[in-house]
Amino acid sequence: HISRVINKNAKISEKASIGPFCYVGPNVELSDGVELISNVHIEGNTKIEKNTKIFPFASIGTQPQDLKFKNEKNSLSIGEKNIIREYVTINPGTEGGGSKTIIGNNCLFMISSHIAHDCKIGDNVIIANNVPLGGHVTIEDNVVIGGNSAVQQFTRIGRLAMIGGMTGVLNCLLYTSPS
């Protein structure tokens, strides 16, 4: 579309789709089947794998919201078959957390969720509307976080956890099996 802005140094698969009013920065990589619907902003050292779909007004790969960040090299990796809905924000890592934010495969990020710097998210995770994750959060596979919940920084949520809506997660929630 004529209204999109794609930096000449971005690596875009011929099988990716970029809709109107999208911005794709110079160090961005978009794989086969990635679809930016419209009004999507992607920058930084961001790599998005196959068949991920991103909806309007998502902001991906912008500078971390951390006062210690001093423009050091960092990255954001988003796996395959993710759905990133409207107004979602995802930040890359910081030096204090290994400089990487990593998102697995087959995840759903609903409207207005926020994935802060240095988060590690497994596969098949669902994060409902208006859920912010603080920095350095780890979410293992097959987790569901209900709407309007909040997850404090440096928290770990174990596989198969189901967190009800409007929950404040202040401590680690690890998977345990019944005895």
In which residue ranges do the predicted regions lie?
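Structural signal for interior beta-strand "rungs" in well-ordered beta-sheet cores
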Residues: 1-174
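Conserved small/polar residues in nucleotide/adenosyl-binding loops
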Residues: 175-179
